[in-house]
Amino acid sequence: IKAVHDYEELIRASIASASNDHRLGANEAPPAIISVFIGSQLSAVLDELENVTKGKLSPEEKTDLKLNIVGKIPEILLDNTDRNRTSPFAFTGNKFELRAVGSWANCAGPMTVLNTIVAKQLKDFKIEVDALIESKNLKKDEAIFNILREYIKASKKIRFEGNGYGEEWEIEAVKRGLSNNKTTPEALKEKKSKKTIALYDEMGVMSKIETEARHEIELEEYILRVQIEGRVLGDIARNHIIPTAIKYQNTLIENVSGLKNIFGNEFKIHAKEQIDLIEKISMHIAGINSKTTAMIEERKKANTMHGQEAA
């Protein structure tokens, strides 16, 4: 949990893609805000651990911790309960699940991030426990409980048991200081941050050059995919949808013209629905064409920005 708290933006970056931008926050997919769901029982255990006495523990406190707090953690069994499908990172009885990875994505990327941040956290935990034992003359279990208490306090804001789809969670996430990077370009910035580069370098995963190269490749892949989708969408809109709409509109116009020939001035009564459809089709054609033009212009701007960034 502490590892996810410290590197939530990197986890979000690891699952970023053009298609996942459309999926996150809808269609039974978790939101772009990274949070941890552990359930009410484990939350209660962590809340009690948070109140552990600072420093040395009395024999009574140790007994209470081992019997009444740690002892309450249930036997880990295969989970068959509701798993809060709105949570991107959930504990489901015997494991944590990262649910935000796209269906076509290679899971090696997110797994690299998860393994690295957990390894980093375990390393830091060992260093901090040893330092506390040496500086405060504490026993190992006392030092462990003291460090755990600080970790639980520090990472509390990443824990969320509610509905991740609701607007209320977005507001609450802002109050907690959690990131909400809804697009891939925003999310990928974390991959070349000083924090990420230092992490990979310290853990011997990737060098600074390798990290920056991967970021550039992922950004280029995103741009290429969006470019292709934009061009295909523009082609479909202007060369297929609009011509088909005009063809149908012409059929309606011929129908209205025929009704006018038959009914004279009363044709508007009989052709009311057709005339309404003709007007709506004209409105939609204009909307499709103007939005396609706007999309092309934005695509040109994106090309220019990408060229400047590459330079």
Question: For each of these PLM feature ranges, what is it?
Answer:
Residues I1-K2:
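Hydrophobic, small-residue-rich alpha-helical packing segments that form membrane-like cores
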Residues D6-A311:
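Acidic, glycine-enriched catalytic cores built around paired aspartates
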